[in-house]
Amino acid sequence: MAAITASMVAELRAKTDAPMMECKKALTEADGDLGKAEELLRVKLGNKASKAASRVTAEGIVVSYIDGTTGALVELNCETDFVSKNDDFLGFGAKVAELVAKQNPADVAVLSALEMDGSTVDAVRSALIGKIGENMTIRRFVRYTNGGKLVSYLHGTRIGVMVEFDGDEAAAKDVAMHVAAMKPVSLSADQVPAELIAKERSIAEQKAAESGKPAEIVAKMVEGSVQKYLKEVSLLNQSFVKNDKQTVEQMLKGVNTTVKGFTLYVVGEGIEKKQDDFAAEVAAQVAAAQKA
């Protein structure tokens, strides 16, 4: 059997970006043949990626990219908070955000087929899954290219905001931070989704009905609750986080600035995380051991 040297392992790692121990195992299995070892790793890492693909990805990062009046905000998911801090994963996210801004893909499927590093986005993603051992997905993205000015704000890597505006950049950055903190669902009250209003109205009706007041009073109570809700969740009507004596709209008017739109991404929002039942897991392991 051929001797496996450190330089051989380093060369294979440079070619495949696989972990050192995986490179050494592949070289041993290939009896020192670098070409065969590389092929073995490609197959092995591909299988590893396939196995990981079914696992829930509720952690991750939000990445932004701005070039003039074109920008992109992207959410990428992984399985653990640890991997969300991995330099390779962060680097992949930065490249994806730049591609979205520059190539304008219609959706994640189109984005996945775009060229990246001499391959495709999806191939690079799969290779990264194989290297790190966790499932990773590109969940969603938004692209701005309407000619307005853009600013972004990232709270760590878990919350990302992009704001399109005309006027004062410092004020727009304050708005981006406000959005991250207060999480409005729309720019103005008339843009709040109908399903959210209907849900809030239903809750208000149930509460008002319990008051025992006359129907006309109940109706006014319900309408008052709905209007209060609309002010609380629409950006322009919210109290400005840095000065609650004025609304966001009033602050913007004071500096002659207009917000044309915004996007807020929170990592894992709406994704159902798997809850580990350790007692059940131990019981299953004991049962399996008894059968063996």
UniProtKB/Swiss-Prot annotation:
Classification via InterPro entries: EF-Ts_dimer_sf, Transl_elong_EFTs/EF1B, Transl_elong_EFTs/EF1B_dimer, Transl_elong_Ts_CS, UBA-like_sf
Keyword GTP-binding among UniProt keywords: no
Involved in Mg(2+) ion dislocation from EF-Tu: annotated segments: 80-83
GO CC annotations on file: cytoplasm
Main localization category: cytoplasm
Compartments reported by the entry: Cytoplasm
UniProt GO MF annotations: translation elongation factor activity
Domain of life: Bacteria
Classification via PROSITE patterns: EF_TS_2 (PS01127)
Keyword set includes Transcription: no
Pfam families in alphabetical order: EF_TS
Keyword annotations: Cytoplasm, Elongation factor, Protein biosynthesis
Function: Associates with the EF-Tu.GDP complex and induces the exchange of GDP to GTP. It remains bound to the aminoacyl-tRNA.EF-Tu.GTP complex up to the GTP hydrolysis stage on the ribosome.
Family membership noted in the UniProt record: Belongs to the EF-Ts family.
Name used for this protein in its record: Elongation factor Ts
Source species: Cupriavidus metallidurans (strain ATCC 43123 / DSM 2839 / NBRC 102507 / CH34) (Ralstonia metallidurans)
Recorded name of the encoding gene: tsf
